[in-house]
Amino acid sequence: MITRSDFDKLLRNQQYEELKSYKVENAVILAAGLSKRFLPISEYCPKGLTKVKGEILIERQIRQLQEAGIKEIYVVVGYKKELFFYLKDKFNVIIVENNEYDTKDNIESLNLVKKILGNTYICSVDNYYIDNPFRLYEYKGYYSSIYVEGYTDEWCINTDNTGTIQSVNIGGHDADIMMGYVYFDRVFSKQFKALLSKIPDDSEYWHQVWEYLYIHNLDKLHLEIKRHEPELILEFDSVNDVIKFDKSFLKNN
């Protein structure tokens, strides 16, 4: 493995032949959930298909990935799945159906696409990126993060002096929190798939977000932190969250 400074230099000089093993292969957008906290809108329209600032949420994310050069995009759907099918023709994405979206959490969505996990972006349909954060070459696996002052009930990241995540706590003060997309490199994906394949059918892991498997296996699953400015990554958990950003949201949906 080359050093990070060598990676950055090769990237600046556009020496892409030397960076083949660092090229992003694909992306997965997780869009299967019920979005219960997005009621009443989600009763008739999944969160990812709502219009924010004039753009359909999932379409904006697909465009950003494609503009970065990532052409192989998997969209995992479940709740009102048929409403997402048009994306296949419009954007040439691959639709994966999660028919257990109402009994299992998003770890099942990753289980359905585990064969294609390699150098892979893992994206959530409820994020909105002010600027395009994606790129075609990445040095190492990471979890995106923003810094929050004061108390937060989000997942708080602790790192060593190299930026590698050492522990994750739910809730904290003045902390870097998990927020936004994740990048799995091939090493991480290999370990993650091995752990995924060993989960028993009756395990509680199937009823948790995939990050629980990650934080319980930090000795095997290594990701760095990737810090972003707080105003550049938005997460829409509720209708009120969107209205704060887009005053016309209810009128347009």
Predicted features by range, described:
Residues E224-H228, L234-D237:
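Conserved active-site beta-strand element of glycosyltransferases/polysaccharide synthases
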